[in-house]
């Protein structure tokens, strides 16, 4: 689909990978609204890119329903995620271990439920940003890998509900397959693993191959939205040296 004048809502779009996506969407003519907590970062973003902004907690169920009811987006990107506490399995408290579930999965549940129950209009697309940790785990990040895999599952479950109710909404998972320095999650993860392995964070992330800075990530997500060959798949891996690859096809 062409993104020109499409109404797009991006959660967690004020920094990191989300910001790179917002920049790419604006460059392709989309009308973007960014939902995030930090008012100062949102103010700066509004001035620099001309996007609309809403300061809100993405785990606030009431705010979630209000925002989608008011904006009725053509495309919804659920990118917001908390930086997980790092440490080995023998070090993390239950609160630290479950932090990604309390934030990322809770937010995903509320936004997906709102998209299904309002519902969004037929033809809408919802992208759920997961992580490469959903494929291989992340032993230094507690429950993070499991939380990101759950979001992938939830996109699949949401498609099932959409099909059963004949809503015409497509849900897809976006899976960045490498850590990206300059992002909260990427910096925390790379630092933790690099320290454990006795190397610098830059050396650790080099193991993933070609880098994928936030704007490049954004361009790859735009290609998923814009290229018809990605319209039907369920999950797509994004990587600097391999581009976009389908990880899971949509259920027949």
Protein language model regions, located:
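Conserved Rossmann-fold SDR core element
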Residues: 162-183, 203, 229-236
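Catalytic loop of short-chain dehydrogenase/reductase
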Residues: 125-165, 175-187
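Rossmann-fold cofactor-recognition segment
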Residues: 47-61
